[in-house]
A protein has these predicted regions:
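A charged N-terminal "starter" segment
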Residues: 1-111
């Protein structure tokens, strides 16, 4: 499908069924941006990898791209941890952290 800005605007203005928040993104651009970002860091830090924040946006299409390139799921809650597991991330590919860490949940996730 060839979407232009005009077509997107027409669709948004003529629709009563769209809900918010609404994200308009190109999965190929997203993948290219992440891949380029990782490659730039690996020039200087060969073991670099990326962790994608589920808190920011846990849209499955974005998460699948991160998983496809070997990135990590970065989660801060039991709900996000379970989403990462549901989306196929192994525990070894999940970073569990946060501003106010809950030690009990971290221990449960580690087991």
């Amino acid at each position: 499908m060839n979407l232009t800005l005009e077509k997107i605007q027409q669709r948004l203005m003529s629709s009563d069924d769209l809900k918010t928040p609404l994200y308009i993104a190109d999965k190929n651009d997203f993948k290219r941006n992440i891949t380029d970002f990782v490659a730039a860091f690996r020039k200087y830090y060969p073991n670099y990898n990326i962790g994608y924040s589920f808190k920011t946006n846990y849209c499955k299409e974005f998460i699948n791209v991160v998983k496809e390139i070997g990135g990590y799921a970065e989660v801060v809650s039991p709900k996000e941890y379970q989403l990462a597991r549901n989306y196929g991330f192994d525990d070894s590919r999940i970073i569990y952290n946060g501003v106010i860490p809950d030690l009990g949940n971290k221990i449960r996730c580690a087991n």
